[in-house]
Amino acid sequence: MRSVRLSITFNDQLNELLAQGEDRFGERVIAEKKALVYQTIRNHLAYFPASRVRDPDLGLHLYPVSGTPFVLVYDFDEAELRIHFVLHKRADRSTIDPADVEW
């Protein structure tokens, strides 16, 4: 299994996205969605990171998290899975710059 590195950018984005839905959906749903994101990273992407095709414009992989409105943006090698961003599935991806990631 690969080690997993989560960027500070990912963490901030996830917290912001979850906070946007808290009033509408409640704490329980928000906690479930957060758990789904982390379970997907730990139980699937860490083992099968190549299960999604690389976006040619970004040079990174995109993975929609089932049961959530979120898409993970990541790269990997044999030793490590690196989660760069998390976005809403309808977000404009053309403005993403991998150089903006804070680790």
Located regions from the model:
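Acidic/proline-rich low-complexity IDRs
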Residues: 5, 13-16, 57, 61, ...
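Charged, solvent-exposed alpha-helical segments that act as regulatory interaction surfaces
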Residues: 23, 27, 47-54, 92
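Enriched for short, Lys/Arg-rich terminal
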Residues: 67-103
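Conserved N-terminal glycine/acidic-rich loop preference
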Residues: 12-17, 42-43, 50, 70, ...
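A short, surface-exposed loop/turn module that caps and links secondary-structure elements
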Residues: 39-67
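Arg/Lys-rich, positively charged N-terminal/basic patches that mediate binding to nucleic acids
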Residues: 1-36
